[in-house]
């Protein structure tokens, strides 16, 4: 039986140790995300056979487990996940798998899981130098937006700190209010996550930056290190009616805060056509492929 518990700040050290043992951790394997997403779902963690196991229960009751992370006994940890999922008697799946992970699951449990590639959840991985320099013809539109911003606005950039976090939260709330999205529930949930992340900003080791126009915060971004080489951007907000704000905060943040990282992980697009177009327009070095698995019950139907 897996001894799950709610993630606490005291779990940070051992969880990060397990994450650092991975070849290339993706956004699911981030202590900041695990801790902050408890604002909108029931997340539990445990050490099982030397691996990190994460269990997420969504508001609709569906349960997903992260593939075991770390250098422990992955096969035994997987067996415990399967036992836990079946024992609960509710629909469940396993997510956050790379190709190697999916092959391990298939080798040991192919008879009870539908395993599939999940393009909507692939992380976009960029070279930090590309995001900083924006060289070449393909980045000309980005440079044009930035040039307009620099020439037409009285702007400043600064690091996010305890002093300006309240202004960032106020800006995020205003951004949501102005949003034209028909279904605002996902954005409202995101705001809950952002607020929790800011509440523990320093303790979680986040890095962030913001833009001001005439003293007013109009954009911010924040994230955390996944490894010595990879920084993961969790959130990025800018007012859409201010031309160049998104392009500017992206470039300023990478230039000022992320020069020591080789890669910048800007997470997935969740299947959003507009978000996918925006992420592809920055020409990722590669996509971190992901696979998901859904448990198939005894009558051969997906749960």
What do the predicted segments below correspond to?
Residues 1-55, 298-303:
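Non-cleavable N-terminal signal-anchor transmembrane helices
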Residues 28-100, 212-242:
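Conserved donor-binding loop and adjoining core beta-sheet/short helix segment
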Residues 91-108, 119-122:
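Short, glycine/charge-rich beta-strand/loop segments that flank catalytic centers
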Residues 93-94, 158, 263-266:
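Short catalytic-loop micro-motif centered on adjacent basic/acidic residues
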Residues 101-115, 144, 271-287:
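Conserved active-site alpha-helix within GNAT-family acetyltransferase domains
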Residues 110-184:
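Acyltransferase donor/substrate-recognition loop-hinge adjacent to the catalytic core
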Residues 163, 167-216:
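Short, conserved active-site entrance elements at the starts or edges of catalytic domains
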Residues 206-296:
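Aromatic (often tryptophan-rich) hydrophobic motifs at membrane interfaces
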